[in-house]
């Protein structure tokens, strides 16, 4: 279920402070975060945010189509290697 409109979007305060500082300085360095649950807000457009996927930080360049989505949606946590093919089916 989506979040109630009266509550507004959720964003961790430590991430919000880093975003505001980067916008103020016009800094293009990636912002490293573990907060996959934070929502992308319009202030983040044009920034690169390194989102942790459990193993490493995946760089995510934020565009205007991403506003309203969560950061974790753009850093996959699982690697799919495909199903093992049956040897009899190959013949």
Swiss-Prot record:
It holds the Pfam family Ribosomal_S19. One of its GO terms (biological process) is translation. Keywords: Ribonucleoprotein, Ribosomal protein, RNA-binding, rRNA-binding. InterPro entries: Ribosomal_uS19 (IPR002222), Ribosomal_uS19_bac-type (IPR005732), Ribosomal_uS19_CS (IPR020934), Ribosomal_uS19_SF (IPR023575). GO terms for cellular component: cytoplasm; small ribosomal subunit. It comes from the Bacteria. Gene3D superfamilies: 30s Ribosomal Protein S19, Chain A. GO terms for molecular function: rRNA binding; structural constituent of ribosome. Protein S19 forms a complex with S13 that binds strongly to the 16S ribosomal RNA. Belongs to the universal ribosomal protein uS19 family. This is Small ribosomal subunit protein uS19. It comes from Pseudoalteromonas atlantica (strain T6c / ATCC BAA-1087).
